[in-house]
Amino acid sequence: MNPIVMKKLQKFIGYTFTNITLLKHALTHRSASSQHNERLEFLGDSILSFIIAKALYHHFPKMNEGGMSRMRATLVRGNTLAEIATEFSLGKYLQLGQGEKKSGGFKRESILANAIEAIIASIFLDSNIYTVERIILYWYKNRFKKMNPTGTKKDPKTRLQEYLQSKHFSLPIYSIGQIYGEAHNQIFTIYCKIDGLSELLIGIGASRRKAEQDAAQNALIRLEVE
């Protein structure tokens, strides 16, 4: 990759690499090379979770564990990381195989999110935990300002579970109905079975998790909880 292009990306990120190979590795999807970024992604995921958890602990001293867990989940989830990647115009720097390029992989949420995690790991390996912490907190500065500790709403699955438990009902059972599309661009249909309801509640989403959340939301509406 052109050194001028790499210099521009490093400016967006806010960090200049000593070993630029680490950054190139972080940008390489498995479709492009056997030397891909998945191991870096694994490491970066853990580093990000730790740093965000630490920041929440210090920013919100009166918040309980459940509240901090929900806020962390919001801050480290795929669409948040993809938003950060978009702010860096990261898609145009990714190294993708021809198939992924043709299918629009450079703008796919999961690929962008994974690349951000890989970049986090590459910064850590190129420097130290204190440097990568400073960089991450810089990326998240405005997001922390917008976080409302009293307004962090639980996700639909959690709300449904808590409602059913409060009524002493059995927990919902989620099962996969159908999966449409190619492996890199699938749509999931999930069925949610709740004791006392004759019909199955249906959820649809771009991942199993999202489809389950959609099914749980529909269940809450059907139960007239929301």
Curated annotation (Swiss-Prot):
Residues 155-225 form the DRBM domain. It is an enzyme of class 3 (hydrolase). Mg(2+) binds at E41, N114, E117. GO terms for molecular function: double-stranded RNA binding; metal ion binding; ribonuclease III activity; rRNA binding. It comes from the Bacteria. PROSITE patterns: DS_RBD (PS50137), RNASE_3_1 (PS00517), RNASE_3_2 (PS50142). The active site is at D45, E117. Pfam families: dsrm, Ribonucleas_3_3. It is found in: Cytoplasm. Its EC number is 3.1.26.3. Its cofactor is Mg(2+). Transmembrane segments: none annotated. Residues 6-128 form the RNase III domain. GO terms for biological process: mRNA processing; regulation of gene expression; rRNA processing; tRNA processing. One of its GO terms (cellular component) is cytoplasm. It catalyses: Endonucleolytic cleavage to 5'-phosphomonoester. Keywords: Cytoplasm, Endonuclease, Hydrolase, Magnesium, Metal-binding, mRNA processing, Nuclease, RNA-binding, rRNA processing, rRNA-binding, tRNA processing. Digests double-stranded RNA. Involved in the processing of primary rRNA transcript to yield the immediate precursors to the large and small rRNAs (23S and 16S). Processes some mRNAs, and tRNAs when they are encoded in the rRNA operon. Processes pre-crRNA and tracrRNA of type II CRISPR loci if present in the organism. Belongs to the ribonuclease III family. Homodimer. PANTHER family: RIBONUCLEASE 3, RIBONUCLEASE III. This is Ribonuclease 3. It comes from Buchnera aphidicola subsp. Cinara cedri (strain Cc).
